[in-house]
């Protein structure tokens, strides 16, 4: 999906594009194929890698307009497996679970958002008009039974996006998350994809088109966006939105309604301005 977005941006001559990837060979080849595109190695689970990439970009261009936090992996081990023991007296703790999906899919997004806000705010526009789009998943809205760690990370992305969006928006930065259904990427192998309903796959070009609409503030640019149900969000409301994408269209997904007014008051009190000097250090 990241490649599809890069290709779509490369067709618009006013974009300088940076691709970050852990696969140096693939990233370098892609950068050669696309105009105005630079590759920078980065393991998104390592803050120093991401910081170096952002710094290199900013030193070269002096501004940042859009960031697509898209890198992701899924767990390859069975969370539900139970190692066998000779008898109940020989039972030992199981090996520590492998957590690459938590590290890449959630921690990597947190690092990316943290760096994005810094360089957005140091750009000439001081953040106004900046766009950060995060890749969550349908597994961030519904339980993904065979990949609970991936699902936990993607639920985390949606919650993280909603939590930062208001404060980012105060600086003019729009933060949104896409929650696609199944898209044939390298997330799983062909046997894995074959276990899903064959008629429900989404083309990567569909994802890229929606991402660019979020970046542009709608279609036409700046006019807001209308989902498949006909619900329209004007530009000034097009932030903090989780956009679910299926093979049939895309849908704005609201956060849960408050159980009562008391809970609304509690959560309203968490705005950053209330907590600086209280819970937060200045």
Swiss-Prot record:
Query: Sorted alphabetically, which Pfam families does this protein's record hold?
Result: adh_short
Residue numbers annotated as active site: 150, 154
Induction comment: Expression and the subsequent production of PR-toxin take place under static culture conditions (oxygen limited), whereas no expression of the PR-toxin genes occurs under the strongly aerated conditions required for optimal penicillin production. There is a negative control of the transcription of the PR-toxin genes by the penicillin biosynthesis gene product(s), or by a regulatory peptide encoded by a small ORF inside the penicillin gene cluster.
Report the InterPro entries cross-referenced here. NAD(P)-bd_dom_sf (IPR036291), Sc_DH/Rdtase_CS (IPR020904), SDR_fam (IPR002347)
Named in its record, the pathway it takes part in is: Sesquiterpene biosynthesis
**EC number(s) on file:** 1.1.99.-
Check the record and name the Gene3D superfamilies matching this protein: NAD(P)-binding Rossmann-like Domain
Annotated Gene Ontology cellular component terms: cytoplasm
Q: Which residues bind NADP(+)?
A: 23, 70, 150, 154, 183, 185
> Cross-referenced PANTHER family, in alphabetical order?
15-HYDROXYPROSTAGLANDIN DEHYDROGENASE [NAD(+)]
Q: According to its UniProt record, which protein family does this protein belong to?
A: Belongs to the short-chain dehydrogenases/reductases (SDR) family.
Q: What does this protein do?
A: Short-chain dehydrogenase/reductase; part of the gene cluster that mediates the biosynthesis of PR-toxin, a bicyclic sesquiterpene belonging to the eremophilane class and acting as a mycotoxin. The first step of the pathway is catalyzed by the aristolochene synthase which performs the cyclization of trans,trans-farnesyl diphosphate (FPP) to the bicyclic sesquiterpene aristolochene. Following the formation of aristolochene, the non-oxygenated aristolochene is converted to the trioxygenated intermediate eremofortin B, via 7-epi-neopetasone.
Name of the protein in question: Short-chain dehydrogenase/reductase prx7
Q: Which organism is it from?
A: Penicillium rubens (strain ATCC 28089 / DSM 1075 / NRRL 1951 / Wisconsin 54-1255)
Q: What is the lineage of its organism?
A: Eukaryota, Fungi, Dikarya, Ascomycota, Pezizomycotina
